[in-house]
Amino acid sequence: MKTLLLDLALWSLLFQPGWLSFSSQVSQNCHNGSYEISVLMMGNSAFAEPLKNLEDAVNEGLEIVRGRLQNAGLNVTVNATFMYSDGLIHNSGDCRSSTCEGLDLLRKISNAQRMGCVLIGPSCTYSTFQMYLDTELSYPMISAGSFGLSCDYKETLTRLMSPARKLMYFLVNFWKTNDLPFKTYSWSTSYVYKNGTETEDCFWYLNALEASVSYFSHELGFKVVLRQDKEFQDILMDHNRKSNVIIMCGGPEFLYKLKGDRAVAEDIVIILVDLFNDQYFEDNVTAPDYMKNVLVLTLSPGNSLLNSSFSRNLSPTKRDFALAYLNGILLFGHMLKIFLENGENITTPKFAHAFRNLTFEGYDGPVTLDDWGDVDSTMVLLYTSVDTKKYKVLLTYDTHVNKTYPVDMSPTFTWKNSKLPNDITGRGPQILMIAVFTLTGAVVLLLLVALLMLRKYRKDYELRQKKWSHIPPENIFPLETNETNHVSLKIDDDKRRDTIQRLRQCKYDKKRVILKDLKHNDGNFTEKQKIELNKLLQIDYYNLTKFYGTVKLDTMIFGVIEYCERGSLREVLNDTISYPDGTFMDWEFKISVLYDIAKGMSYLHSSKTEVHGRLKSTNCVVDSRMVVKITDFGCNSILPPKKDLWTAPEHLRQANISQKGDVYSYGIIAQEIILRKETFYTLSCRDRNEKIFRVENSNGMKPFRPDLFLETAEEKELEVYLLVKNCWEEDPEKRPDFKKIETTLAKIFGLFHDQKNESYMDTLIRRLQLYSRNLEHLVEERTQLYKAERDRADRLNFMLLPRLVVKSLKEKGFVEPELYEEVTIYFSDIVGFTTICKYSTPMEVVDMLNDIYKSFDHIVDHHDVYKVETIGDAYMVASGLPKRNGNRHAIDIAKMALEILSFMGTFELEHLPGLPIWIRIGVHSGPCAAGVVGIKMPRYCLFGDTVNTASRMESTGLPLRIHVSGSTIAILKRTECQFLYEVRGETYLKGRGNETTYWLTGMKDQKFNLPTPPTVENQQRLQAEFSDMIANSLQKRQAAGIRSQKPRRVASYKKGTLEYLQLNTTDKESTYF
């Protein structure tokens, strides 16, 4: 079985990409009045005779379809493409090994561009299941066979032979029946004989009965599978047998070969499943003596195929297979006729999903399909008459309505009194003895009930008198400041959330505890609430958190509950970094989590608390040893449950709590654990309130449940998946209890230990070691991320403050002010900035300044200077501080000023085309003081007369000129750099009087593309000229149809993200040290 499932996965990977072309091929072969059917022909045990007989059946069906379409006035062509398996590649004499064969045939059809409108075949369950997955639910499939449970409830698959699901429904119905003259007992036990040599149909029928999570197993109290012939033979006369009923599958010859002439106990009933054999209804057939203890389950006979050319030499079982292929053709013809008459396209998903919940005219009469496309039929239960030695009909069963109809009310059975015996041995003692024992038992029971009631009354009285554990507030201690709440590997934890967590965590009796708000103000609990609290005190179980009592703090009442270090299960599932899927949270760990919750709930349901009422993944917590514990139980009269995604549908409709409601909540949690997705994950709905509404209001439709992807489950996962689906059944009575859930998971969990030859403690230690290694890796990884983040922060600081200042702040926490003997300071501003703002929107002004100053910043980066600040349109730069650089400060400022002026000669505004932007530049050198001012948003500021003079040099300058003081020129003369300058003459500087100033015009042997400054010297004329330029620019914009840009939320993103947002981790050494 495991090998086959691995084949399924492998072939899915190999062939899945090829099916993407199905839709185009189907469109080619299903249009313009020509429709093609793809028929897969596979030779195996399901149809051992020559495949030519199946081809004859298909051809006969095609002739019938063509005639029916012609009679309906539809002039279309219907043909079939036959694809045969390659016996040299696939030597599969058994359907149970034909997975690859079916996929290979499908690939051949696809490569040949002959993909038809519908796929007929194969009969093998494995092949059908895999091909259904690979056609991606968009292609109709009709199968003659595919009996297994894995092919149930497939949206585009139709099965024309009775599947195992129908057989289970009959057996459960018959077992429960107890109101017939010949069956007065309900049965609840059975043996199932299965040796692995059965035919294809029998293999899957018995496989369904064997599955521990199937409907049949769920309804029976006892079921044992017999796998050896000797086991079957021993049961026939074993007085200690647990059941009188044995189910097997095959014909009378198979039974005789197994049983022979051995004696059989008089209470034994053998149910022989032989559905596809109508020889029992022949007039000349006599039942052999060994069939007297046997009830034969078969299908109602059909004689239409007996004289057909293609089936004349076939065995009865093979005739049914051939008939299914033929009816598959007729079914397609029926649906094709309907769609063509309605003018609809058959290559749409609607056609693929239409083969269900209908009745069509088959070869031997009407054929009915149920809501899932499975054929409905009439099953017949036969018995051997001891008078006539003939097979007679005992009852019939209609699979469509799931109802039994008795036929022979006075059968001549071999069993005593012509009644079917009880299924359990030894239920036939004398009536007097039954009466004696019954009376004795009733008296004992009454005495026991009276004793229990008296005991319960005394305990309840004690509980009412006893005061629950109310802890004095002085025994609750806050956590120490050096105690952390939980281990966290995130470097950006929310400190506010951490503070709230601290308020809810305290210490009691030297243990860390959680304080649960009970929404109670005064602590005067009612009698019922006191009983609930006392019940909680008595619970002490490994998978349930301990309740220590209540405490009153301020005006609030808290429950004091055991603390679990790793937080809730929901948090663990969300943390894919600390608990990765591949190395830690594997399938075995998920099973152990489910097992822990099931054990805790099983104990809780058997305790006095009886029910949880608020079970969800956030109420399941994980301790330091990775053990899952349930919390927040009890106190249902204090904290009534609310509607949530975990709430059972019956409690959404009517507020209540129940054990079956807890089982539903467990199913939702199990889906979270298995898929590790959000609560109630489903692709069809994302909104929480809508999910709750759809669960509450099913309105007779298919119940709304989260996705579980049963089709892709591996073999080891399938049993758990089916268990989860049973937990969220709409009918609460169909849900298993936690005892059964615990038993099932214990068996599955035990298999892991047996395979690895290790105990539970070995597994726990191994998991903690694995977690420790993973934690070390994560700590190392987070350390690297921290260092990278620290370097990123340093780079950002260096853009705001000088490097030496940042280093001093990090090392000392402050920067000492310092006096610098000689520095050079640069000032510039935009001429006519106020006028430009008048004709621009605020966002256009921001865009303009951002474009200009980003370019200034790039120029500044190439010189040994420090950008001090920008205020409006003013730009201030200094050199020679905080790191002294000799005479370089004047050279760097001068070169920088020339490059900035050269750039401004090429700059043009987008919203005012043609308008030149004029700037004034002033430069001055001298002493100044510098230091960091303030704590919030600290800034490195300059102080002294040099700063004021540099500002005066700018304000007294002219547009597109670099106004330089005499002190700066004197420093430049002391250097080897030959700067070009002109004497401006005497200039009045406020606070300093008249001084000789200069125009910096360039540098020898280096060309700067400086703009030509305006020739007008008079200030008023300059303003008039600038106003004329703006007016011309506005006319150009209007003529070109350029509209003012609408304000943008982040104007600076226009030409790329701000540089400080582009900072990333760096490979350079950190500057932290």
Swiss-Prot record:
It is a single-pass type I membrane protein. Keywords: Cell membrane, cGMP biosynthesis, Disease variant, Endoplasmic reticulum, Glycoprotein, GTP-binding, Lyase, Membrane, Nucleotide-binding, Receptor, Signal, Transmembrane, Transmembrane helix. Residues 455-1073 are cytoplasmic. Residues 489-749 form the Protein kinase domain. It is found in: Cell membrane; Endoplasmic reticulum membrane. It is an enzyme of class 4 (lyase). One of its GO terms (molecular function) is peptide receptor activity. Belongs to the adenylyl cyclase class-4/guanylyl cyclase family. The protein kinase domain is predicted to be catalytically inactive. This is Guanylyl cyclase C. It comes from Homo sapiens. The lineage of its organism: Eukaryota, Metazoa, Chordata, Craniata, Vertebrata. The gene is GUCY2C.
